[in-house]
Amino acid sequence: MKIRSLLANCYLYFLSAIAFFLQWVKPESKVTLLISFEANAKAILEEYEQGQYSYKLNILYTQQASAIAESFPNVDAYLLQEKNPIHLIKAVYLMFNSKVIITDNYFLLTSVLNKRKQTKCIQVWHANGSLKKFGLEDITNMQRTKTDIKRFQKVYSSYDYLTVGSEEMANIFKKSFGIKDNQLLKIGVPLTDPYYRENKKKISDTLNIQRKKIILYAPTFRDYNMQSIQLPFTEEQLIHQLKEEYVLFVKLHPAIQNNIDIKYSSDYIKDVSNYALFDLLMAADILITDYSSVPFEFSILNKPILFYTYDLKLYQQKRGLVDNYLSIIPGRACYDSESLINEIQTPFNYSKIKVFSDRWNKYSDGNSSQNLLNFIENLIS
């Protein structure tokens, strides 16, 4: 932990040095997307290409979000390898040359904007809800040094605005990032836009599973176990107890996707980690997750959600969950496969899903990207 902290601080000093030597750069009528996930960026870029906006939009993307550059060839896109000094210099230049930065994650890079009042930073975040504690609320902060916390705060203080889809998430951001009410843009979260449109993907045809229902298992990652995954069902259970009616799709979290080889390509269990989450959620009949943010967007579709919480106490202890987790989730917390199977075989209470979605997607109505780009238009005009 101490070595990582030292390296992070050295990285921060290097960024500060770059910012000092590039302080002469003047902002133009440009907006730069600084992204590590595809969902928000895709929704924003689709709206940008359809609309009439006075500013130019660029993309700074990490390897994890590289598909974005391929999907939008008409937009200038630059790969960001955060350990590459040349990439960092170029990134700071692009940011300083822009009037607005839109980001979707925690980047130390945005700390250079703290003394850059002519460039505004908008955090759209990569989730429209949260069941985990993060930021200043993260329980692992107890193991951090004061210097670490100060470094985190430098990043959080670089956010001029944050988009939110609900009062619940607004309150979480205020506690997690130490921000104020006047920084909150209650215009919805861009990544939710596609869920309000009819756009069902034929993944069932692609993977040759016609006539079977899809159970999508999309767990979050465990900091304390990045090398393995516990599946909710065996192939035998899918065949015998669930009567061959379902196929289990497994979507790994990006943080562990390259660490684990599920080695399943059977008729009943398939690794679909390389597919876009949106496409999988549209195709799924049932979602099984745990402490992930996936239910917040999936709930818009009003389809059954189950929670496989076999390590609830351990996760709470190691990572930390929001208060009243069990009363917030719109489905039963199941601690073993038998409980999950029983829930699947029992009629589902859809009213819980609607209440959950209405609560957490209050400001998301399918027009969040347009709302954001219009806000930026007014901001820089």
From Swiss-Prot:
InterPro entries: Glycerophosphate_synth (IPR007554), TagF_C (IPR043148), TagF_N (IPR043149), Teichoic_Acid_Biosynth (IPR051612)
Principal subcellular localisation of the protein: membrane
Membrane topology: Peripheral membrane protein
One Pfam match: Glyphos_transf
Function: Catalyzes the addition of a single glycerol phosphate residue to the prenoldiphosphate-linked disaccharide, as a primer for polymerisation by TagF.
UniProt name for this protein: Teichoic acid glycerol-phosphate primase
Family: Belongs to the CDP-glycerol glycerophosphotransferase family.
The keyword Cell membrane is assigned to this record: yes
Subcellular location field: Cell membrane
GO CC terms in record: plasma membrane
Keywords, alphabetical: Cell membrane, Cell wall biogenesis/degradation, Membrane, Teichoic acid biosynthesis, Transferase
Induction description: Positively regulated by WalR. Mainly expressed during exponential growth and rapidly shut off as cells enter the stationary phase.
SUPFAM superfamilies assigned to the protein according to its UniProt record, in alphabetical order: UDP-Glycosyltransferase/glycogen phosphorylase
GO MF entries: CDP-glycerol glycerophosphotransferase activity
Organism: Bacillus subtilis (strain 168)
Keyword Nucleotide-binding: no
UniProt pathway: Cell wall biogenesis; poly(glycerol phosphate) teichoic acid biosynthesis
Domain of life: Bacteria
UniProt-listed Enzyme Commission number(s): 2.7.8.44
Reaction(s) catalysed by this chain's protein: N-acetyl-beta-D-mannosaminyl-(1->4)-N-acetyl-alpha-D-glucosaminyl di-trans,octa-cis-undecaprenyl diphosphate + CDP-glycerol = 4-O-[(2R)-glycerylphospho]-N-acetyl-beta-D-mannosaminyl-(1->4)-N-acetyl-alpha-D-glucosaminyl di-trans,octa-cis-undecaprenyl diphosphate + CMP + H(+)
GO BP of this protein: cell wall organization; teichoic acid biosynthetic process
Gene: tagB
